[in-house]
């Protein structure tokens, strides 16, 4: 598979945050190619799909970057999925597995609107899966999921028949 041109700007960092993990650092993309990155993520969905979406949901913390920028670009609202203790009036929470441990996410009550969930990178799919389940639990309808980088070798995640759309994929 031909890789997206933005892939060349990722920086692979071995043994971060723990030994045995090859971390894909998106910092160079954010610093030097942010507009191109948001444009590429925007193209993951058609104009018709964007027209039907009400909110972009960002998964803490790097998902906030992409969801808020896409929300601004497409004149949509922004909703946060946060780690414990960061939101008032939490309606639901969920624990999930990471490539290197476990964590927990929380959300406020939703309102039945349609959402696209955004994150920076999907490894095992744990945080995206938790965010999708939380969105449904609090009252949102998940109509799409997007990330910048998908480490496909570590996951086969889908939610209600939807797979995560990504700009950059690594199969090994």
Swiss-Prot record:
Places the protein is found: Cytoplasm
Record-level GO BP terms: adenine salvage; AMP salvage; purine ribonucleoside salvage
Keywords noted in UniProt: Cytoplasm, Glycosyltransferase, Purine salvage, Transferase
GO cellular component, one term: cytoplasm
EC number: 2.4.2.7
InterPro entries hit by this protein: Ade_phspho_trans, PRibTrfase_dom, PRTase-like, UPRTase/APRTase
Molecular function terms from GO: adenine binding; adenine phosphoribosyltransferase activity; AMP binding
Matches recorded under Pfam families: Pribosyltran
Main location: cytoplasm
The protein's annotated pathway: Purine metabolism; AMP biosynthesis via salvage pathway; AMP from adenine: step 1/1
Catalysed conversion reaction: AMP + diphosphate = 5-phospho-alpha-D-ribose 1-diphosphate + adenine
Quaternary structure and partners: Homodimer.
Summary of the function given for this chain in its UniProt record: Catalyzes a salvage reaction resulting in the formation of AMP, that is energically less costly than de novo synthesis.
Family of the protein in this entry: Belongs to the purine/pyrimidine phosphoribosyltransferase family.
UniProt-recorded name of the protein: Adenine phosphoribosyltransferase
Organism, as annotated: Hydrogenovibrio crunogenus (strain DSM 25203 / XCL-2) (Thiomicrospira crunogena)
Organism lineage string: Bacteria, Pseudomonadati, Pseudomonadota, Gammaproteobacteria, Thiotrichales
Gene: apt
């Amino acid at each position: 598979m031909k890789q997206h041109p933005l892939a060349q700007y990722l920086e692979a960092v071995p043994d971060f945050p723990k030994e045995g993990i090859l971390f894909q650092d998106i910092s160079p993309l954010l610093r030097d190619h942010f507009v191109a990155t948001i444009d590429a993520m925007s193209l993951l969905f058609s104009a018709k799909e964007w027209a039907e979406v009400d909110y972009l949901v960002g998964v803490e913390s790097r998902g906030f970057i992409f969801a808020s920028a896409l929300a601004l670009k497409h004149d949509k609202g922004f909703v946060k999925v946060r780690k414990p203790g960061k939101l008032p009036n939490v309606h639901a929470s969920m624990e999930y597995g990471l490539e290197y441990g476990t964590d927990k996410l929380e959300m406020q009550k939703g309102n039945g609107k349609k959402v696209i969930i955004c994150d920076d990178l999907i490894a095992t799919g744990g945080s995206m899966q938790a965010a999708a389940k939380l969105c449904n639990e609090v009252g949102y309808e998940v109509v799409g999921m997007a990330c910048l980088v998908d480490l496909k070798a570590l996951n086969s995640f889908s939610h209600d028949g939807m797979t995560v759309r990504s700009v950059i994929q690594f199969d090994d």
